[in-house]
Amino acid sequence: MLESYRQHVAERAALGIPPLPLDAKQTSELCELLKNPPKGEEDTLLHLLRDRVSPGVDPAAYVKAGFLTAIAKKQVKSPIISPIQAVQLLGTMVGGYNVQSLIELLQFPTVSVSDSSETPLVMGGEGKEPIAAYAAAALSKTLLVYDAFHDILELSKTNPYAKRVIDSWAEAEWFTSRPQLPEYINVTVFKVPGETNTDDLSPATHATTRPDIPLHALAMLESRQPGSLETIAELKKKGHPVAYVGDVVGTGSSRKSAINSVLWHTGEDIPYVPNKRAGGYILGGAIAPIFFNTAEDAGALPIQCDVTKLETGMVITIHPYKGRITNEAGELISTFTLKPDTILDEVRAGGRIPLLIGRTLTDKTRQALDLPPSTVFIRPQQPTDTGKGYTLAQKMVGKACGLPGVRPGTSCEPIMTTVGSQDTTGPMTRDELKELACLGFSADLVMQSFCHTAAYPKPVDIKTHHELPDFFSSRGGVALRPGDGIIHSWLNRMLLPDTVGTGGDSHTRFPLGISFPAGSGLVAFAGALGVMPLDMPESVLVRFKGELQPGITLRDIVNAIPYVAIQQGLLTVEKENKKNIFSGRIMEIEGLPDLKVEQAFELTDATAERSCAGSTIKLSVETVAEYLRSNVALLKNLIARGYQDSRTLLRRIAQMEAWLANPVLLEGDADAEYAAIIEIDLNEIKEPIVAAPNDPDNVKLLSEVANDPVQEVFLGSCMTNIGHYRATAKVLEGAGEVKTRLWIAPPTRMDEHQLKEEGVYSVFGAAGARTEMPGCSLCMGNQARVADGTTVFSTSTRNFNNRMGKGARVYLGSAELAAVCALLGRIPTVQEYLDIVANKIHPFAENLYRYLNFDQIAGFEDEGRVISKEEQALLI
């Protein structure tokens, strides 16, 4: 074991990174060696057990906890670990498999100090107290105890050591024992000018390495600013922490892996947790809200401030309590206000997630003891009630908190009804769930998809495809299968109206209810605990009026939102001192009540590109009821096909049917207040609007970009639905091979099946299209990619530099316009486009833009059945 491990250490050292944590098999072999250690290897073996085994409910932690428990109970002996030291090591495992052992050890017969001549490993000198005292000390700093809290509370009535634990939790000693943030902090600046998106920090081409934090961090900024890692290493020689600084920081979707990479290079090791770092300082003129929250979760200190006077190599002093930044001469160069109110406590606790868990544990303990709330913590300051009405979003979040509504600025923990995870973030979410000691989800429905890696899987992806389904379904989650399609296209069909959720993908933007996308750590928290911390954002109302003009599509309406905001001075494309009215706020959309839910998602989905915290759209009861009837049929079909967890699917079906029996939707109040109101007159939009290379905010009229040659066209992503593919086929029908490389990737297997049944795929074949497996395909650029330096017209979500291909120029627009681009090999003029649409699409629009109503498809519920009808009837 040691020989093979040292070979692995050498391979990783050549890359400048530490070895992987031990797996269960290695840990088991390590435990055997610890019983009879080879001479001279004692320190190495002890280090491996203490520092190189992941905590929580990792399989290796199960082995470690069992071994240490056996030593503590004197069932097994090791010459280098005493029973008391074993208890102390159990206390470093954060929760999960160690908890029950420590509770048992609270009651274990006295072990005198003479049982060992070893000095303690962790918690100071051994006195004359029994082993139960050490178990109490270990549990006092263990926060992830879940239902075991009640066992310890009951035991504390008769057991003095259990009483010590309860008293310690009540006094928040887990928190007060940690150092406060100092009055001033000297840091060395590492600045990336302009915008740093999460693709820069966590390149999609390296997505498969994201769970391996040190390895993935080697790719940070490799395209955006080559040589950055060497620069950071050089800056560290000044002897101060390195602060990451940028004008705009953290836009994009890969927040957790991006934060992991930043903190790997600028943060500090977490004791007893291998290959993970916390802390660090991130300064930005603007910091994307989800990225900001993910930094909070990880124990970093994110600061939004003017960074124009900060340059790489400067040594600056941050004064966190004064809100000042000074240079080496003591001159003031920037000011800031720390947000949220609790940020100092978050940093002290090691992150927002540990603070929330620990503070809840302290509050629960004090409540059980009839003590007043602790004054140790900075409590969130709640806003003054204005007496005005609530917006739709405020009512939805209020409902999830048991309130009529929630005001902006309110700190709350809404119930998470639906949680989504996908396959490039799922392995990180799994690791976070293990660290949170989660063995069962508290959120009502947690879904895992396999949409980003199914088409061209690497060996590590195949491993993920095999392991993640059981991991999620064994905890009560719903696991999709590779080839099923895109997370959002599926998760939307599992939603309940007027509820709140989240997902580990920035495009988790529910068209029913509201969602607040999050990094993998917070998604794991939401799944494990069933709630999520939220500082309620303000809302921006986008109100449409008028009628869609000929040739204008919903994607043009999506792009009209930033277009109008730019005209009104509410949004700028430039990154320095960027203005964005939507950033960190909820976009609430009205004026299009009769859209189908599939169409509505185009609008809510694109709020990710506006850096919104969330979004709502006002729809009619009839629209929502039609969608839910279809979704009931789909979920019943999943049960018939053997999808797990069937109990979760059955529960969601029952909830949908209950809503259909009494279909009522929340509505915003007429006197609700908004940070801004933007009115868009559809009658004034006479030509398509596209996002030009390479920024989703860089929107232009078609007439401004006409005749630009296009080499590749992509029709796919969560922004598409079945109508787009029918319309594209109609444009291409009878035209022979197109003049571009054309990629086709439907969002789900159901779309693909229906399109094949209708003969649409034969048109794609005749056009020379490359048809892809249902899923994300080119959108994220983590597998297939366009040619280097090419110009692309795409229906996907984002057009960041190098995302779809190295040096690619990417336009974003409608499927209909994409089809015309493929036909012509260039962006058409307005008249060319309108003529083609008028002749090839408008006459057939009613038939083309039909949506998948599964309840109306004969025999659909029995398609792919592997569970007999009798078995299914018994389940139901």
Residue positions per predicted region:
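Short, 15-30-residue, compositionally biased linear elements
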Residues: 1-8, 96, 332, 336-338
